[in-house]
Amino acid sequence: MADLPQKVSNLSINNKENGGDGGKSSYVPPHLRSRGKPSFERSTPKQEDKVTGGDFFRRAGRQTGNNGGFFGFSKERNGGTSANYNRGGSSNYKSSGNRWVNGKHIPGPKNAKLEAELFGVHEDPDYHSSGIKFDNYDDIPVDASGKDVPEPILDFSSPPLDELLMENIKLASFTKPTPVQKYSIPIVTKGRDLMACAQTGSGKTGGFLFPLFTELFRSGPSPVPEKAQSFYSRKGYPSALVLAPTRELATQIFEEARKFTYRSWVRPCVVYGGAPIGNQMREVDRGCDLLVATPGRLNDLLERGKVSLANIKYLVLDEADRMLDMGFEPQIRHIVEECDMPSVENRQTLMFSATFPVDIQHLARDFLDNYIFLSVGRVGSTSENITQRILYVDDMDKKSALLDLLSAEHKGLTLIFVETKRMADQLTDFLIMQNFKATAIHGDRTQAERERALSAFKANVADILVATAVAARGLDIPNVTHVINYDLPSDIDDYVHRIGRTGRAGNTGVATSFFNSNNQNIVKGLMEILNEANQEVPTFLSDLSRQNSRGGRTRGGGGFFNSRNNGSRDYRKHGGNGSFGSTRPRNTGTSNWGSIGGGFRNDNEKNGYGNSNASWW
């Protein structure tokens, strides 16, 4: 992969050595440049290798065994926990060998098969991992502000972490905490609320799961309220709730939770839209100690009386900015302020976000109490461990240029972003016809198809994933070595999030983007990002930047280097109202910042609980 930048450095059709004339000539693939007339002939795959897009999804689906798009796992798949709950709330709690007896946590027996499923087998030739280069985290800046900020930890140790959790962390091959984990673990174990500004890929999931599980393992299950349910009307009483904007992110958090609750009494569950709600209700009814949910589906379960939030000790809002961007603020406020969740003083609240604009600051002021603000520098999004290449390619030449890239060096997993669902399907079929193992994910796919596609990609059954913006944020696929922006987004923030899918966990990666005249609105933003990460700036991009500057053109997309950049600071220190620990009066009604019909996204018509037909629900 290190040679890829050199191999593709001459792909720009502005390069006159390749027959270009400053951007006007048609793109000529390298393997045809010696011929008189450029043409492109599609190779014909062997009959035994020919797979249509639909066939590939069905083949990938047989690899996963998901139940109707919902992770309805057996007791073994859930780390050994089963439904042997003592619903009366006594001191004895048993779950398939994992027990809480007389105030003591007794871990369950080891299960070699389940360990291999959860943590992988490193000796297996089909096991693919680029590893976590923890040393690359050492220079990441961290700023913590607030009253009495605890000292950060330097390594995983007990205390503060639980001994069983330490064993599971070791099984996951985590050797030392990332910067966000060094600070968040002592903050949460000290009982403080937390507002953390951290990018996806910084280890933030472990940053809230590790201390949360430590406290749950030590404190045990909460008793179910007396007369709260009868035999004919059962209800889930989770101790911890994690809200996430998309079903993809929710399932990823759930999968991580399965790892770190292995052999414990804690049983995680996940609920989200687009999957049969009956299956999810049955899973919750079997026992749910940690609930990972999207706001729309959780509101549905609350309305049906299948979930109670009365026992919530820990509330986590992951990718809070994304949830507000998607219009989820009314649903979130309904869950937190209008249901039976304990008040802010009687629960611990953790909020994680890549950015903290004003609306997120307001949400934190309402939901958090005397919180600590944590700002962690970027890991992977625009850092030097990602080699960024911007190639000038007209729309009509993109398929040829893509084949050049994939033929130059195609190792590991490649994630290709396109702007439309139709293009995702068309490009996937095109790649399959060229004998590439490709699959796609976008909003028009059923939930079962999306899960099968992701499972096939993660397992390297398909090593190319074509995706729309639904996969631009939150997806945690650690082995992606190459991100290709087949279509560049119109917002520079989206570019940052997309290329952050590679170079994860301190690893190196390559991000290649096809640029043409349709993308001039993000020229300034691209220049800033490339310069910030010490990347080579193409000549054509510099020329366009100078032309736009003379013409008074402003950078499109806004946000990242303007108003949103201010959100990475603690507003209590930088012009905010009040001092550390101050809170404004709690909002007891409907949000004043957005209508019930859509929060901050007026272009989406939906009711206060979300549109069940929306692809993001």
Curated annotation (Swiss-Prot):
<feature type="compositionally biased region" description="Polar residues">
    <location>
        <begin position="580"/>
        <end position="594"/>
    </location>
</feature>
<feature type="short sequence motif" description="DEAD box">
    <location>
        <begin position="318"/>
        <end position="321"/>
    </location>
</feature>
<feature type="short sequence motif" description="Q motif">
    <location>
        <begin position="154"/>
        <end position="182"/>
    </location>
</feature>
<keyword id="KW-0067">ATP-binding</keyword>
<dbReference type="InterPro" id="IPR044763">
    <property type="entry name" value="Ded1/Dbp1_DEADc"/>
</dbReference>
<feature type="region of interest" description="Disordered">
    <location>
        <begin position="542"/>
        <end position="617"/>
    </location>
</feature>
<dbReference type="GO" id="GO:0003743">
    <property type="term" value="F:translation initiation factor activity"/>
</dbReference>
<dbReference type="GO" id="GO:0003723">
    <property type="term" value="F:RNA binding"/>
</dbReference>
<feature type="region of interest" description="Disordered">
    <location>
        <begin position="1"/>
        <end position="90"/>
    </location>
</feature>
<feature type="compositionally biased region" description="Polar residues">
    <location>
        <begin position="79"/>
        <end position="90"/>
    </location>
</feature>
<dbReference type="GO" id="GO:0005737">
    <property type="term" value="C:cytoplasm"/>
</dbReference>
<dbReference type="InterPro" id="IPR000629">
    <property type="entry name" value="RNA-helicase_DEAD-box_CS"/>
</dbReference>
<keyword id="KW-0547">Nucleotide-binding</keyword>
<dbReference type="InterPro" id="IPR014014">
    <property type="entry name" value="RNA_helicase_DEAD_Q_motif"/>
</dbReference>
<comment type="similarity">
    <text>Belongs to the DEAD box helicase family. DDX3/DED1 subfamily.</text>
</comment>
<keyword id="KW-0347">Helicase</keyword>
<keyword id="KW-0648">Protein biosynthesis</keyword>
<dbReference type="InterPro" id="IPR011545">
    <property type="entry name" value="DEAD/DEAH_box_helicase_dom"/>
</dbReference>
<dbReference type="Pfam" id="PF00270">
    <property type="entry name" value="DEAD"/>
</dbReference>
<keyword id="KW-0396">Initiation factor</keyword>
<dbReference type="InterPro" id="IPR001650">
    <property type="entry name" value="Helicase_C-like"/>
</dbReference>
<feature type="domain" description="Helicase ATP-binding">
    <location>
        <begin position="185"/>
        <end position="374"/>
    </location>
</feature>
<dbReference type="GO" id="GO:0003724">
    <property type="term" value="F:RNA helicase activity"/>
</dbReference>
<keyword id="KW-0694">RNA-binding</keyword>
<dbReference type="GO" id="GO:0005524">
    <property type="term" value="F:ATP binding"/>
</dbReference>
<protein>
    <recommendedName>
        <fullName>ATP-dependent RNA helicase DBP1</fullName>
        <ecNumber>3.6.4.13</ecNumber>
    </recommendedName>
</protein>
<comment type="function">
    <text>ATP-binding RNA helicase involved in translation initiation. Remodels RNA in response to ADP and ATP concentrations by facilitating disruption, but also formation of RNA duplexes. Redundant to DED1, may be required in conditions in which DED1 expression is decreased.</text>
</comment>
<dbReference type="GO" id="GO:0016887">
    <property type="term" value="F:ATP hydrolysis activity"/>
</dbReference>
<keyword id="KW-0963">Cytoplasm</keyword>
<feature type="compositionally biased region" description="Polar residues">
    <location>
        <begin position="7"/>
        <end position="17"/>
    </location>
</feature>
<dbReference type="InterPro" id="IPR014001">
    <property type="entry name" value="Helicase_ATP-bd"/>
</dbReference>
<dbReference type="Pfam" id="PF00271">
    <property type="entry name" value="Helicase_C"/>
</dbReference>
<feature type="binding site">
    <location>
        <begin position="198"/>
        <end position="205"/>
    </location>
    <ligand>
        <name>ATP</name>
    </ligand>
</feature>
<feature type="domain" description="Helicase C-terminal">
    <location>
        <begin position="385"/>
        <end position="545"/>
    </location>
</feature>
<keyword id="KW-0378">Hydrolase</keyword>
<feature type="compositionally biased region" description="Basic and acidic residues">
    <location>
        <begin position="38"/>
        <end position="58"/>
    </location>
</feature>
<dbReference type="InterPro" id="IPR027417">
    <property type="entry name" value="P-loop_NTPase"/>
</dbReference>
